[in-house]
Amino acid sequence: ALLVLTSCTGDFKDINTDLSGITDEDLQIDYNEHGIRLGVIQQGIYFNYDYGKGKNWPFQLTQNLNADMFSGYMHDGKPLNGGSHNSDYNLQDGWNSAMWGHTYSYIFPQIYQSENATREKHPGFFGVTKILKVEVMHRVTDYYGPIIYSRFADPNAEYMPDTQEAVYKEFFC
């Protein structure tokens, strides 16, 4: 079989370059490659992660419909889900798993990458990452108890969660 590739212009790459994004060269200026990750990590503190176009619905799932309802801080006076949900102590899996799913899908990978990229050469960024990591993860362990913390992304780990006591000791060491 004969396969022929042609293009209609010699500057195809220039025409199809996305000028709205950040280039690799831009990331090197003023340590942006580290600072950008810190912004994402900060969004995980009370989970205002922006899925685009100003959508901030994860906060409602991770906070309002979960802990706020369970603790009685917030209550929906209108029957929702047949009148049986977290404010009536009928815990809803989708609401209760939201903080875990969002944190481990979007925030903790950025923490992991930031720690690895800054540990040796950029101790200031590494220190800020560690502080933000505690700010993000203390809420997760307070919600769930044992969490995956010290062995996150360890290919040799069997993903046994750390006890809450071990996590808090790790926070302060």
Where are these regions (language model features)?
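Short acidic-aromatic linear motifs embedded in glycine-rich loops, typified by GG[WY][YF]DAGD(H)
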Residues: 9-172
